[in-house]
Curated annotation (Swiss-Prot):
Catalyzes the reduction of nitrite to ammonia, consuming six electrons in the process. Heme c 4 binds at C271, C274, H275, H382. Substrate binds at Y202, H253. Pathway: Nitrogen metabolism; nitrate reduction (assimilation). Residues 1-27 form the signal peptide. Heme c 2 binds at C153, C156, H157, H290. The gene is nrfA. Heme c 5 binds at H264, C303, C306, H307. Belongs to the cytochrome c-552 family. It catalyses: 6 Fe(III)-[cytochrome c] + NH4(+) + 2 H2O = 6 Fe(II)-[cytochrome c] + nitrite + 8 H(+). GO terms for cellular component: outer membrane-bounded periplasmic space. Ca(2+) binds at E201, Y202, K250, Q252. This is Cytochrome c-552. Heme c 3 binds at H87, C195, C198, H199.
Amino acid sequence: MMKKMTGKSFALSALVAASFMAAGAMASDKTEPRNEVYKDKFANQYNSWHDTAKSEEITDALAGDPSLVILWAGYGFAKDYNAPRGHMYAVTDVRNTLRTGAPTNAEDGPMPMACWSCKSPDVPRLIEEQGEDGYFKGKWAKGGPEVVNTIGCSDCHEKGTPKLRISRPFAERGMEALGTPFDKASKKDKQSMVCGQCHVEYYFEKKDDRKGFVKFPWDSGTTVEQMEAYYDAIEFSDWTHSLSKTPMLKAQHPGYETWKMGVHGKNDVSCVDCHMPKVTNDKGRKYTDHKVGNPFDRFDETCATCHSQSKEFLEGITKERYAKVKELKARAEGQLVKAHFEAAKAWEVGATEAEMKPILTDIRHAQWRWDFAIASHGVAAHAPEEALRILGTAVDKAADARVKLAQLLAKKGVTDAVAIPDISTKAKAQAALGMDMDKMNAEKEAFKKDMLPKWDAEAKKREATYK
């Protein structure tokens, strides 16, 4: 039987508990998440990294291409999708997007904790403190007061040093699946692998013992066909399309994979060579520019170190490639949008699951390939031939689906063309899907007003205990 605690013993217990709580709040031994800690020791790198804040403009990708709303019907990207900005905005943008919803508490909202995984050095800190089981458990809102420092120093570097590291266990496992463990890689390979922690295709596992864990689908390789076969084998889907009822795959941003396929990757030209070149400060000292950006903005330090052609010549070639990719992208989207509406019509007139299965497989594969190509930001520069090849197969598979749909619809007595609603603007496309955008936007504004100040206050209090 427990003895009754005296006032003195109770006070001592409280003191011990408080000390443990304080210790638990300390920054990790391996990870210092606060980027500003390094602003003096690595001033040139810090200041250039901070310049990624100069990409203030928000580009609404759905407004620029309303077909995307239909292609992602039933998924968060149909609500909101902006072009990516600089690293300084990683936490801000994931907080503000409609995709993360408007949670009112730590257990609320549509998205899992895994949605923070590439946004902050607080992520490796949390994994080190809680283990992957603890980190990945729960909803996105659980991480709100914890994940507050944007992508920065400790994501790519060992604590307090320039030495490169992979800071996320799931990325380490991905590299090992390719037979290229980080600790045995060359310096050049490591310069791209640190980018490949996040600029990759990934998915959230659904197994009970690993539910919500991030995984790279590289067990069979990194081509679009190899990953497609992997997903099919495990019967994985990101969501079910609200029109066609297709079990869909959403490509993320497989920049690392497509870079490997292109001429630069094959010739050992790293991400850093083109996007973070060595530059000289006003004292004549060289350092790595951490304002990740377009190589043409620093042509002499990037392209000109290998190419003898002029900036105008190389820019012209790149623009031509972008134009060709954009043209084939639009053709694939046109076929896919029609396929989704035609599939919806087929269900409406009594199509069976057995009749629809081969059609939905074609739609699934076509859109996965289209998405893989367009979500690879920079693919027209990294691997234009591969982008065009993939988009060509997307067009073919979408066309195959539509031929099968035409035959099935005719069998069901539908011989006229299936009507497509007006989706000429983002608003019209969302209205065609019955999306209540006014309600979503109002809820998001309330979340930003009510929850974000609480998250920031809690984070500030916790970080005040750091040494």
